[in-house]
Amino acid sequence: MPSINTKQYDGIKPMYTPDAAEVCGSHVDIDFPAAAFVANDLIRLATIPAGVRCVDYKVVLPDVDSGGSPAFAWSIGELNAGGTDLATVYASGITTGQAAGVYRAVNSAHFEASAAADRRIAMKITTAAATYAGSGKTGVAVFDLQA
């Protein structure tokens, strides 16, 4: 399975961004494909524009690993210039998706990231699912953004 882009990442579906000091919740749908992800695949989520800070984020995932010993794990962060890997990792070793659940930022790496330039945010699959069960399921990433 190759890496995928969300509709927000590709500009097909708008990503809401704040135009003032209020915090705006911006939702990014994650449509899981029929084919299983393998290690190092990327789910390119969205671009946070320059001048906008991410104050918090959550990722809500369905159960995408139905194996008796689930293995699915991922990281989240900013893509490198080529869009081929994470250059800045906000969090790693995340296992949400082994069972349905919510992952919420547990450190401030996303908040401390420079807002001087656009940041392309992605999830990187670090361990493939033991038994992939994501086909046709949808998750969501919610970025709380502030201008």
Question: Locations of the language-model features?
Answer:
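Surface-exposed, low-hydrophobicity beta-strand/loop segments enriched in small/polar/acidic residues
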Residues: P2-A147
